[in-house]
Amino acid sequence: MLTFFFLWISTLLLSSFIVYLLYRRRSAQCPPLPPGPNGWPILGNLPQLGAKPHQTLDALSKQYGPLFRLRLGSVNVVVASSSAVAAQFLRTHDVNFSNRPPNSGAEHVAYNYQDLVFAPYGPRWRMLRKLCSVHLFSLKALDDLRPVRQGEVACLVRNLRRHADTGVLVNLGKALNVCATNALARAMLGRRVFADEDAQLAEADEFKEMVVELMRLAGVFNVGDFVPGLGWLDLQGVVGKMKRLHRRYDAFLDRVIEENQANAKSGDLLSVLIRLKEADAEGEIKLNNTDIKALLLNLFTAGTDTSSSTVEWVLAELIRHPDILQKTQHELDSVIGRDRLVAESDLPNLPYLQAVVKETFRLHPSTPLSLPRMASEECIVNGYKIPKHATLLVNVWSIGRDAAVWNDPLEFRPSRFLPGGEREHVDVKGNDFEVIPFGAGRRICAGLSLGLRMVQFMTATIVHAYDWSLPKGQECQKLDMEEAYGLTLQRAVPLMVQPIPRLSHKAY
C-alpha cells in the first residue's frame, strides 16, 4: 500500500514537471505582448491620457518604443507611433484591422453605426464607399465639380475683401469652413447651405460650432466605452451631450432632405441616394432615410472641418515664418501674376505651395490620432502578439514629429519635400507612412482627393490674394500655436487676422 502511495506521488510530481516544461516551452515560443505602463484598478490607463492624448501617447512612445500597449478599462489598446510600425498594421495586416471597435459616438451620433466611417467592414460599407467614390470623389466627378469649387473660393475672396475694406478682423477658420461647406453642399445637394447675407452668418456660426463639438466629443475617451459596467452612469456627461448634438444634426439633415426633395436636381448625390431609397432592385442593398442622413453627416463633418482647420494652420505657420510666406507668394506671382485669382488648374505648377501644405500636414495633421481599428484575429506585429479584438490607434501626430525620420522635426521647413530635400518623394495619399493625414489602407479617407485639392486651392488663393496682419500688439513670432484636442486638431485660439489686398483691383 505504501509503495503504491509513493508511486502515485512520483507520477503526480513527474506529470506536473512535464506540464511545467511544456508550459515554459510554449511561453518561450509565444511572442510577448507589447510593453506598456501599469494602470489603475478597473480604469487601467484611462486617467493617464490627459487633455491631449496624442501628446501623452507621444511621450509614452519615447519610453516604451514605437509599439506599446495600454489597458483602457477592460480593453487592450495598441499604439503605433512610427511610420514603420504603422505600415505593418495598415499595409501588411490591413484586412485584419479593417473593422472598428464599439464606440458610443457611432451609436449615439452616427445613427447607430449606419454611417460610412463606423460601418462594419463588409458589403454595405463597400456599397456606401462606392457611392461616394463614383458621385463625389472620382476623377470625373472632381473635374465636373471644379467650377463649383472655384465659385465658392471666389466667394471666400469677396468675403475677405469686405473685411479688408472695412478694417474688421476675420475669424479665418469660420470663413474657411463656410467655403468648404458650401462647396461640398453644392456637390451633395445641388445648392449652398449658407448664403452671403448677414442673416445667415448666425446659421453658419452655429453649424461650425456643431462640427467642432462633434469632433471634440468624438475625440473623448469615454469611460463607458472601456468599462461597460460604468456606461449607464455617463460619468463624463459625454453620452448626454452626444444625444443632444444628434438631435440638432438630425433636425438639420431632415431640413436638408426636405428642401432637396422640393427642389430636386438629378445630378447631385442626395438625389441619387433618394432614388436608391425608392428603388426595388433585387439583390441590391436598399437605403432608408436613416442611412442617407448618416452618410450626409459623415460628409458634412469630416469633409469640411478637416479642410478648413488645416488651411487655418497653414496660414498661422506662414504668418510665423514671413520668409516662407514671401517664397510662397513669389512662386504664386511667377506662375499666375497679379491680374487674376488662382485657378485649380494652376496647382500642379506650384511645387513650393504643395510643399508648404505637406509640411503643415506633417506638423498639424487634421486627425492627430487615427480613427480606432480593431483586430479581427490575433496576429504578430514587430515581434509582439496583438490579441484578438485589441483596439489599434495610430499616432499620426507622433509619426510626423519622429526625430528618427525627420531632421529638426519641430521646425516648419517645406524645403524638406522639395528636390534635394530629406523626403522629396513622400506623398500624403497613404503610400508613404511618414505623413498620413488621411490614413492608409482599406479604410483610408474616402474624400482624400477632394480634401487635398480643397486645402491646396484655398491656401493658394488666400495667400496669393492677400497679405495678412495680426491684431494690433500681437507679434508674428509669438502667435499662439496651442492645440485644442479632438477628433480633428483645432487651434485652441481661433486665428483672427486682417486681410490686406495685394493683387490688381480687377482680380477681385
UniProtKB/Swiss-Prot annotation:
Cofactor: heme
Pathway: Flavonoid metabolism
Presence of keyword rRNA-binding: no
Tissues expressing this chain: Expressed in young cromes.
Biological process, per Gene Ontology: flavonoid biosynthetic process
GO cellular component, one term: membrane
Stored PROSITE patterns: CYTOCHROME_P450
GO molecular function annotation: flavonoid 3'-monooxygenase activity; heme binding; iron ion binding
Transmembrane segments: 2-22
Keywords tagged on the record: Flavonoid biosynthesis, Heme, Iron, Membrane, Metal-binding, Monooxygenase, NADP, Oxidoreductase, Transmembrane, Transmembrane helix
Compartments (UniProt record): Membrane
Superkingdom assignment: Eukaryota
Entry's family note: Belongs to the cytochrome P450 family.
Job of this protein: Flavonoid 3'-hydroxylase that catalyzes the 3'-hydroxylation of flavanones, dihydroflavonols and flavonols. Converts narigenin to eriodictyol, dihydrokaempferol to dihydroquercetin and kaempferol to quercetin.
Protein's name according to its UniProt entry: Flavonoid 3'-monooxygenase CYP75B137
Upper taxonomic lineage: Eukaryota, Viridiplantae, Streptophyta, Embryophyta, Tracheophyta
Gene (name only): CYP75B137
